[in-house]
Amino acid sequence: VKLGVVVPIELGHSGDPEWILEFARTAEKLGFDEISAVEHSVVVSNTGSAYPYSPTGKSHLPDDCDLPDPLELLSFVAGATTDLGLATGVLVLPNHHPVVLAKRLATLDRLSRGRVRICLGLGWMREEIEACGGDFDRRGKIADEAIAVMRALWAGTGPAGVDFDGEFFAFRGAHSWPKPHRETGVPLYIGGHSAAAARRAGRLGDGFQPLGLAGEDLDRAIGQMRRAAEAAGRDPGAVELVLGATLPRLDEARMDRARKLGAGRMVLSASPKAGSLSRVVDEMAACAERLGRV
């Protein structure tokens, strides 16, 4: 099982270059496979949208918390590391035009020599998506087409370019270079907590990252993903399952449970009370030692 660590944005310093490099280099040194960056293009004060991962419906982040663009952050980290994977968790797909996003992801993957893993989400904050020009109510249908656009542009190498004629996006003779480092393109995972996210992962995703789910809810989502994959003529086992945990609580017993569920990767967060980068580093080091990574 591969292990990633989420950038602890709640500490408020992820826009500091020395801070983020210390975090990333420490993760690489300790044997973690990747770091994962989150996204909010804007945060809207007093949003009317309920945050789905808290019983209060409110995000734990203050409005003025540093939230760097995840792809720019990962590009910065790529140049200062050698083998560390570069992931998002999640990139809010409705905030991005897929033609532009395809170029950005391909460039990052090419320059990092294939270290990129993108987990896409549809977002929960209506005001954020609408501020970016997105259609909140139709974002699921648009996302399906956006994924097809990106993969078509990455695969298109012929002299005539790429034609695409969809409901939301259309172009003819389009050339988008450089291509991703990997011929199969940048891996696109689907993150979310809804049945729609699970089904989308089964139909279209290279992986599924269920967010905020445990117990029967998690089992149900995994089943929904696998049934959707089968219905689409895909091998459910080819859709990598990514599970979450906190750094202090992960041990071999939890790893074994993740393996039994079919997980190939785990994404780990610092404890809510970590409070500082030095404490996060201590949690990372202790986790790596428990699991024999160092």
For the regions a language model picked out, list residue spans one by one.
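Active-site-adjacent structural elements that line small-molecule/cofactor binding pockets in enzymes
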Residues: 1-294
